[in-house]
Amino acid sequence: MLKNKTKKTEVYALCRHISLSADKARRVIDQIRGRSYEETLMILELMPYRACYPILKLVYSAASNAAYSMDSAEVNLVISKAEVNEGTITKKFKPRARGRSYVIKRTTCHITIVVKDISLDKYEEIYSFKNPIWKNTIDVYSNGVVWHKK
């Protein structure tokens, strides 16, 4: 049986109203989701997109939040969730010929990055592997490898 530990393992950093298209930010976020902190920094510094700089600042902020609240080292951090949502759209009017006006839409986005410390295990094991309670739904090979029945 697995029991939840009460220690917090995830922290997040949120940046709102960035003057950037959500689709262009998602292109960068998809590259860093699930990677380690150090690998993420290398990727963001070398990618040639404008969206990399605010995301890089946000990853730094999430790492400093993790160091402050969980006392975790940067080596153990992994980007567990990263999402981009559309923000508000501001409209400006550009004057055109014959007294007409043309609407220019400035899109914004909200970016959330969740960092997880992998050194802090989320579950503590109460029963040993020698006597598992899940033996009726999952079989074990003779060499000890677990596989799911389907």
Swiss-Prot record:
GO biological process: translation
GO molecular function: rRNA binding; structural constituent of ribosome
Phosphoprotein as UniProt keyword: no
SUPFAM superfamilies xrefs: Ribosomal protein L22
Gene3D superfamilies (alphabetical): Ribosomal protein L22/L17
Domain of life of the native organism: Eukaryota
UniProt keyword annotations, A-Z: Plastid, Ribonucleoprotein, Ribosomal protein, RNA-binding, rRNA-binding
Record keyword 4Fe-4S present: no
Single GO cellular component term: large ribosomal subunit
Alphabetized PROSITE patterns for the sequence: RIBOSOMAL_L22
Entry similarity comment: Belongs to the universal ribosomal protein uL22 family.
Function according to Swiss-Prot or TrEMBL: This protein binds specifically to 23S rRNA. The globular domain of the protein is located near the polypeptide exit tunnel on the outside of the subunit, while an extended beta-hairpin is found that lines the wall of the exit tunnel in the center of the 70S ribosome.
Subunit structure: Part of the 50S ribosomal subunit.
Protein name (record): Large ribosomal subunit protein uL22c
Naturally occurring in which organism (per UniProt): Orobanche minor
Taxon lineage: Eukaryota, Viridiplantae, Streptophyta, Embryophyta, Tracheophyta
